[in-house]
Amino acid sequence: MNIMIPAWVDGTLQPVEKLEAHKLGLKHKAISVFVFHENKILLQRRALSKYHTPGLWANTCCTHPYWNETDADCASRRLFEELHLTDLPLKNRGKIEYRADVGQGLIEHELVEIFTSNCSNLPKVTPNPEEVMEVTWLDQIELANKVKTNPDEFTPWLRIYMLKHFEQISGTVTA
């Protein structure tokens, strides 16, 4: 199945096949979600079957909206598809744009809508093994330190988020 995502072609937002957008390095829309419980962040380790960055640690979930899908609907859909999380209140933290080489000749050039959820109770997480091989809750400071000392264990986008945008994501400053 060809998944069509919103990407900019010659300055116009158009439906583009997802893999083609990555091969061409086209700027495209994406979402990233960070679920917090107290001072910890829910992280996922990407399944080994993923077509890029397999086995690396990433934020709670991230994906591309389908053409004509809202960012908020996309975030909720992907939380369920990857981790079977439902009914989490999501707060929009604004947009972040980045460009990163993710290997195999693929480029992520994303305009990402960031969402967060702060859970007072620890949610039940059931990873979809086709998407996620492992999850963990990691203290924010410990995560920042690990990203600096062992960057190759983390996806390029999580490294960018933690090193350049974490105040925006965590809500300690406005977007």
Question: What do the predicted segments below correspond to?
Answer:
Residues 1-32:
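Acidic, metal-coordinating catalytic segment for phosphate/diphosphate chemistry
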Residues 17, 55, 97, 106-114, ...:
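Nudix hydrolase/Nudix homology domain
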Residues 22-31, 36-77:
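Conserved Nudix-box catalytic region and its N-terminal flanking loop in Nudix hydrolases
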Residues 33, 61, 92, 113-115:
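A structural signal for short, well-ordered beta-strand segments
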Residues 82:
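Short alpha-helical functional segments enriched in proximate histidine and acidic residues
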Residues 86-95:
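A short coil-to-beta-strand element that immediately follows conserved catalytic motifs
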